[in-house]
C-alpha cells in the first residue's frame, strides 16, 4: 500500500468486483481508520477505528440505512476488546440520540438512554438492574428540564412494574383522579 498526500492509503484490492473494497486512512488525530465500500459507490458503508494505534479496533461505524451516513457506532469503552456501547443517530441530524450500554462490562447490555425529542438531552432512561434481560427501571423527563418527571420500577424483579414515582404531584394522573 502506498500513502497519498491526503493521508489516504491505496485501497486493498478486492478479489472480484462483488467483494467490498477496503481503504486504510489516517485520521486527523493520527488514528488508523479502515473504511469499507461494499457496494462500490465510493462512499464508506462501514469504518473500523483504531483510535490509539495499538492494533485493536476501538469502534466501528456502520451505515445501516444506505443514506451515506455512518449513523450507528459500536464502541469498546473500557478497552477490554468487547463492544460495550452502541450509539445510533435515528433522525439523521448528525447527533446520536440512542445509546445502548453494558455499564458493568459483563457482556450484557443493561441500559438504554434516549433523546426522543432531539433537543440534545436524555429524556428516557431504561435499565435492567438485575441482569435478567428485562427492564426494571424506566425514568422519563417529560418537560425537558433535565429532571426526571416519573420513574417506574419493578422493585421485586417479578417482571411487573410495581412502583411509580412522580416528581411533581400535578403530573401524577392518580393524584388528579
Can you annotate each of these PLM segments?
Residues 1-177:
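Calcium-binding acidic motifs and repeat modules
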